[in-house]
Amino acid sequence: MKLSSQTINVLKNFSTINQNLVIKEGSSISTMSAMKNIIAKATVEETFPKEFAIYDLNEFLSVISLFSNPELDFKDNFVLITEEGSSKSSKYWYSDPSVVTTPTKDITMPSTEVTFDISSDTLSEITRAASVIGAPDMVLENGELKVTDKKNTTANDFTLKLDVPKS
């Protein structure tokens, strides 16, 4: 299986939410922050043949980046990463799912009111800001993405203006 650039970008974005991940059989990927206050779900074009866990998603993505055109072959206990016409290969072992933070239930999201794209860099920046100021909440309001503590009106916050269509 080859991973599309869109799927690689989804995984990069998810790595900013949580460094570990369980990918279930199928084409839906979801993650949850360690504090369990951020949940993300994406449907990708690939269909994963089996469920597997990755302990360090950034490391996994770095291993994939060692190949120009990686081919992933999902085995029982590891994924074999190769490249056609190359002598390179990597055996990347799956993690024990019990040590990985993952949503325990299927995420059922309400119908969307607003949709927008957010870059990996922007998500990384806002997540870093939340960590720096200790903000547990992320709020999208009036085209701005803000991290803050909604329970504390005098809490520090950090805001990024986004290009979000007005409804």
Where are these regions (language model features)?
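DNA polymerase processivity clamps
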Residues: 1-94, 109-167
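Acidic/charged, solvent-exposed loop-and-adjacent secondary-structure segments enriched in E/D, K/R, S/T
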Residues: 100-102
